[in-house]
Amino acid sequence: MDKANDYLKDYQPAKLVLATAGITAASILAYQAITDRDFKDKLNKKIFRSIKSMPGVSDIVKKERAKAKVELKKMFKTDVRNAHYTLPLKGIKHEDLIEEMKALAKVDESHWVDSKVSGCVYLGEKEHTKLLNEAYSLFSLSNPLHPSVFPSIRKFETESISMVSNMLNAHSKVVGSLTSGGTESIFMAVKAYRDFYKDRTDRPEIVVPVTIHAAFDKACEYLKIRIVHIDVDPVSYKVDMAAMKKAINKDTILVAGSAVNFPHGIIDPIDEIAKLAQQYDIGCHVDACLGGFILPFAEKLDYDIPVFDFRIPGVTSMSVDTHKFGYAAKGTSVVLFGNKKLRRAMYFVAPNWPGGIYASPTLPGSRPGGLVAACWASLVSMGNDGFLEKAKGVMETTKKIIKGLQSINGVKIIGDPKAMVVAFTCDNIFYVNDYMSKKGWHLNALQRPNSLHVCVTAKMIGMESLFIEDLKDSIKLVKDNSGSLPKDGTAPIYGSAHSVPDREMVGTILSDFIDELITPDYKPSQST
């Protein structure tokens, strides 16, 4: 100690304090960099926040946010005639109300009835829609939470799960549950793995392709799970298996892949992902929310479809949406598990609640039994032959669209799509999208790389020639006006959003958009 004091006697106390503080701070940062697996992202956020708080910069940011909000709001229009911002003093007559709602429904229908919408409306046939509506109306008061009062709903639910399970070549131990949609199916699967492996790690991680559905990110944010995104091969756009294997560690509880993925319609190498899961004794989830009702039937029709389901050893769960290509009413999906023990990890039970014994398989307590009935009705009415017929039409239309895209100079298809989703890009792709929108098309804008995709539905069967014709014309219009491309529309928004390095800022603008979306166009008075 005396030697240390002699050595430091010539240093000013203030300098010693500052030096010590600096070394301590540097040590803390170094420790965080080593131990905090998301340190880089957190550091980037702090840097961008510091820049945005600088004088002058914050004003620019506010102005750009305001401009973006104005443009984003143009993307949705609401009829504010006969608006009800407070309860009417007297209830409106049923017949008058229905007439008003019919008029509004007609406006909505005009946006998709011409078959120019990617995904969204998957069938839209009047007779099938009528069946769904009648099935719902018969059980509109029912609730699966009360099985003794509504035993028929249990029949519809368990049989729907069984039909979907069988379609995906499930073995005898596979079980499942009905959910409200793909996001909930994925959420419940992730929750099940977290709880199933809780004795193994208290810092769970999942390893997934960067192209997997954002519902995995949502689930991990809610459930406090670290999500590790793996890049895809720049040619095939399938997940990089070497990188996936490298990312697995002692805290990894799950690997996952898509069949097909939402952005590009690519089927990940599920067999290789499942082998990794077996090797490391972890779960393997296949997200087939989009492809689950097309791929099995396309395979039967001898299209080149790789095996992606429970036939692969190591696949321990799957998600598939009945409300997409299962043609059920919006609000149903199925999550399947390889055994009952894994499914039980999904449940919530509250044995000590004063309100009685409470338990539920998924997130909601009460659920609309009418949707369960409509789901069952859709599956049973379509049957194997019905799904085969629709799958053939969808696959043939997709094949012709791919051929048409390949014939257009300057257009590049992303990867090698095997089913009904085709992503493509070209110069000024978002301006091309704006011109396609003016022709009535509703396509999906993508990023990384900037591109568009079309999800071919049964509603779009036979629309391939018009699609390619309109796309060629839109590309020509962009080329002809390349020196004076419009500053309005969605192209500037998408272009800037995809190129901005500050992703937190993009997230803020998206939150601004949601604010506008769920806020009344007119702020109601508090008086009635």
Curated annotation (Swiss-Prot):
Protein name as annotated: Sphingosine-1-phosphate lyase
Pathway: Lipid metabolism; sphingolipid metabolism
Main location: endoplasmic reticulum
Residues passing through the membrane, by range: 13-35
Family the UniProt entry places it in: Belongs to the group II decarboxylase family. Sphingosine-1-phosphate lyase subfamily.
Species classification: Eukaryota, Amoebozoa, Evosea, Eumycetozoa, Dictyostelia
Domain of life (superkingdom): Eukaryota
Enzymatic reactions: sphinganine 1-phosphate = hexadecanal + phosphoethanolamine
Pfam families assigned: Pyridoxal_deC
GO molecular function: pyridoxal phosphate binding; sphinganine-1-phosphate aldolase activity
UniProt membrane topology term: Single-pass membrane protein
Function: Cleaves phosphorylated sphingoid bases (PSBs), such as sphingosine-1-phosphate, into fatty aldehydes and phosphoethanolamine. Sphingosine-1-phosphate (S1P) probably acts intracellularly as a second messenger perhaps by promoting cell proliferation; the absence of S1P lyase increases its concentration. This leads to increased lateral pseudopod formation as well as defects in the efficiency of chemotaxis.
Subcellular location: Endoplasmic reticulum membrane
A GO biological process held by the record: slug development involved in sorocarp development
Description of the deletion phenotype: Cells produce short fruiting bodies with a thick stalk and drastically reduced numbers of spores. Mutant cells grow exponentially at the same rate as wild-type and are 25-fold more resistant to the antitumor agent cisplatin than are wild-type. Mutant cells survive longer in stationary phase than wild-type cells, but are effected at multiple stages of development. Addition of 50 uM extracellular sphingosine-1-phosphate to wild-type cells mimics the developmental effect of the knockout, and leads to increased cisplatin resistance.
